[in-house]
């Protein structure tokens, strides 16, 4: 397990400084790698089950191999630096590139701000950037719901899971996870084109998020009093509704937060989680929940491994 100072500084750098420019962002580079091999292996939109399964698997293996090699070499180079201040700072800065704490808050808050200003059309356009559903027909309630769903799901994807894999496996663990997560975002959905080609990526993402998503849900339960939530309701939501989404993982944070803040989150035609009116105040408290759950994780990790 790596020193807690690396995780604390990495989250601090990401939360208060933000991500590097796209030209040098590792996750953007990973996305370009995925697209490159997709163009090599899947030059046509036609579907062939066996071919797509094989080439989708090869795409994942090749990209993960490249990411692991690069992250491992970077980690070795940093660890060879004798000056501890430079070594710790550089390691933490690189690690921060695997986290999306600041961007999660900013993207989730944007549609909420438009709702506050009674600009529903801009809110729908804003929330379209963070969810895959059609937002054209959404009302105020469902725009807020989509924003909160995205924030609660991405507590795992963007922050807790990268920190967990970094804690156990260092830079290679964090960036291998981010690579799998990027794969899932790009090709891991059940469209005709990616039904088989993206299957390996989707399964691997489900596996890697299984434990982190449940840890993230528990963090939301424990930290509930700090963001205006209710511990008992959060706990009931976690166990009663956590498995009610199509994803085997995302429901645990969404259901926990929905019940903790007494609000109904709904993706029309797919699921309803929690009960109660969604308000702007509850939406903003959801973003506080992100910060407090991450803070709690870092405190627990520091107590255990400092």
From Swiss-Prot:
Keywords associated with the record: Cell membrane, Cobalamin biosynthesis, Membrane, Transmembrane, Transmembrane helix
Molecular function in Gene Ontology: ABC-type vitamin B12 transporter activity; threonine-phosphate decarboxylase activity
GO cellular component: plasma membrane
Membrane topology per record: Multi-pass membrane protein
Bilayer-spanning residue ranges: 54-74, 88-108, 155-175, 207-227, 286-306
Keyword Repeat (UniProt): no
Coiled-coil region(s): none
Pathway of action: Cofactor biosynthesis; adenosylcobalamin biosynthesis
Domain of life: Archaea
Leader peptide range in chain numbering: none
Record-level GO BP terms: cobalamin biosynthetic process
Subcellular location(s) per record: Cell membrane
Record-linked Pfam families: CobD_Cbib
Stated role: Converts cobyric acid to cobinamide by the addition of aminopropanol on the F carboxylic group.
Family classification: Belongs to the CobD/CbiB family.
Annotated protein name in UniProt: Probable cobalamin biosynthesis protein CobD
